[in-house]
Each structure stands twice: as structure tokens, then as C-alpha cells.
Amino acid sequence: MTSVMIVLQAIVPQHWLSRAIGKLAGLSKPIWLKNALVGAFMHRYDIDLSVAECDDATAFPDFNAFFTRALRADARPLAAADWCHPADGVLSQRGDIEAASLIQAKGRRYRVDELLAGSVEEAHRYRNGCFATTYLSPRDYHRVHMPISGRLVKTRYVPGDLFSVNAATVQRVEGLLARNERLVCFFETDHGGVVVVLVGAMIVAGIATVWGGRELPGASAIRESVWSAEEAPSFEKGEEMGRFFLGSTVVLVTEAADLNWCDAPGDAVEVRAALSG
């Protein structure tokens, strides 16, 4: 059955479907439809609004506002560790970068330069570094926060597929995280270069950043933005940097090689909690 679902994902019009879902999720009227969508989603995924800034399911202007809801200020305290988790979810993989490649799933690897959609020379900087991959399920908080303090120097929006990024698909689709549409964000930090990659997926209706707004799926070419040292926005560890409009994955790539992991692959993790002690 899993193989059938993957074949279906490959043949459906992924970007059209994602854009259509995005339009539906952005509807504020009729109110009964908006509330029905939110209510059905809450029931299906057992959503807990007690930690949200707004705990009234009917108060959100549209489904997107509900899905990208903010948490209460005290819901995710910031860890004292040097590195914190960038998102709520499951730590699907983490470890050292070996032979310029990362682990996607057991028996499957993909190259750093493929993930970044850049040159081998650009990826060479991270050859001795570390990586961590966090899968965000539909029930998770879908804002992404800085794993460490840093200065944004470049972003690269990469068009691609929109396969689901659940465990079954990641296990079976070769190079999935380097094939899906994604936003690659490069930062300079006190611990060297850091890349935060926001990976799109089936029915993900867009990726947004706090500095550039929303990127809709279906771009026809790579789009790159570069900031000078004087113009580059800076972010503190734990500060919000972006969000997903429906599910996905965050891949963290570091030049630093000395991360002392606090969690094992498969562990549920919370944003702003300690990633490396």
C-alpha cells in the first residue's frame, strides 16, 4: 500500500494540488466552512490549543492563521545550551556529515551540495560538520526558530517536487529532501556557517520568513537573495525565523563539528529546547 501511495504522489499534479489547498486554507468566508475545517483538523490530529496564544478555535480568521498559530510566551522556554531545536516535531536523523553526505533514512544518504542546490565548493565548508533533521507532523507547532544566534547572509529558494515527507516516503524515495521544493537559509554565527533548510511537501501551501514574507510553491527557477554585512538581519537563538503553511521538515547543517547531541533519532523534540549540550 505504501508503494502505491508513493506512485500516486508521483503522478498527481503536486503543485496544483498544493496551491488549491492553499487557497482553501486562506478562506475567511463562509465562516461556517472555515470553522468546520479547523474543527475537523483539531479532531483528526488531537490539537491542543492550551499552549497557544489564542485558545479559541473559532477566533482564527482562516485555517492558515490557525495552522501557523503562535504559542504562549511561556510555552517553550529557551534552553541555556549553545544550540536549540529549530522546531517542534520528531528528530528523524542527526549526526556527523560524512563523505559530504547526510543520512536521509536507514540505507539512504544524500549529498550536501544537492540539498543546498549549490556548488560542491560551497558545500565543502560543511564537510566536517553536523546535521539534524526534524519532521513536523500536522499536529505540531509550525513556526521555525533560530537554533543559534546568527546573521543572515543568503537565501536560495529551490523549486522541486512536493512528495510527502513522512517516514514511509523518506525511506523509499531516493534523495527526497534534496528533491523537494525548499528554502535554503545561510547564516554566519560564532560557531561558523549554519544553514537552515525549510523543506516543502505535498499540500504545503507555502513557506514564509520573517524577513521576506511568503514563498508560494511552484517557482520555475531558483531565486537567490544576498545581503551585505551592513544590511543583513541578525537573529538571536530561539527567535522566530519562518513558518510552514501545512506540514514539513527542517534540516540543520552546521560547519561546527562539536555538537554534543541531547536527543536520539526518533525522539520527540520541542522548539527552543536544548539540541546540543
Regions flagged by a language model, labelled:
Residues M1-G277:
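Contiguous, well-folded functional domains in the mature portion of proteins
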